[in-house]
């Protein structure tokens, strides 16, 4: 099956999570007017009193043609990925309770100035880089027992 990759926007992505970006976002000045603070861009949610972790994940580029065959979700916390050097990357997401609902399966490509924050329980493809090795600032939950993985029928990503 083929899955069309769409440009990432907050409107298209809102059911799956938050788009972390400054474009079209409100800000206020701090530090004597030298800094624009784009405040509260994503809801970080961590359950069961676990720690919130800030990490760097170094992702390798995926092989082409790009096909996916599994999704994962994290029931106990949100998960945010922000490329550290402005790289474009691709995310694949779906809704669903016990298993991914393939009728909600979507793929998005960022513009190089966006990160994503997956809501708790949103099915998504494991992180990968798009065209080159990419370092992602990652914000998620510490602890164990927070990753469900499900196989899905193979999908080939198609770029317009």
Curated annotation (Swiss-Prot):
Paired cysteines (S-S): none
Record keyword Lyase present: yes
GN (gene name): allA
A GO term, aspect molecular function: ureidoglycolate hydrolase activity
Transmembrane spans: none
Family: Belongs to the ureidoglycolate lyase family.
CDD domains, A to Z: cupin_UAH (cd20298)
Catalysed reactions, as listed in the record: (S)-ureidoglycolate = urea + glyoxylate
Keyword set, alphabetical order: Lyase, Purine metabolism
Pathway: Nitrogen metabolism; (S)-allantoin degradation
EC main group: lyase
Assembly behavior: Homodimer.
Source organism per UniProt: Escherichia coli O6:H1 (strain CFT073 / ATCC 700928 / UPEC)
Keyword DNA repair carried by entry: no
GO biological process: allantoin catabolic process; purine nucleobase catabolic process
Named cofactor requirement(s): Ni(2+)
Role noted for this protein: Catalyzes the catabolism of the allantoin degradation intermediate (S)-ureidoglycolate, generating urea and glyoxylate. Involved in the anaerobic utilization of allantoin as sole nitrogen source. Reinforces the induction of genes involved in the degradation of allantoin and glyoxylate by producing glyoxylate.
EC number: 4.3.2.3
Domain of life: Bacteria
Protein name: Ureidoglycolate lyase
């Amino acid at each position: 099956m083929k899955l069309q990759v769409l440009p990432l926007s907050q409107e298209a992505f809102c059911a799956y999570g938050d788009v972390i970006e400054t474009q079209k976002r409100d800000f206020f000045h701090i530090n004597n007017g030298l800094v624009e603070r784009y405040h509260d861009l994503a809801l970080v949610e961590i359950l069961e009193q676990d720690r919130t972790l800030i990490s760097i994940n170094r992702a390798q580029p995926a092989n082409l043609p790009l096909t996916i065959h599994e999704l994962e979700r994290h029931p106990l916390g949100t998960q945010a990925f922000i490329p550290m050097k402005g790289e474009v990357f691709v995310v694949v997401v779906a809704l669903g309770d016990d298993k991914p609902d393939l009728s909600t399966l979507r793929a998005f490509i960022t513009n190089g100035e966006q990160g994503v924050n997956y809501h708790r329980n949103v099915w998504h493809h494991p992180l990968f880089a798009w065209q080159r090795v990419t370092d992602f600032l990652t914000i998620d939950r510490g602890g164990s027992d927070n990753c469900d993985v499900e196989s899905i029928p193979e999908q080939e990503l198609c770029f317009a």
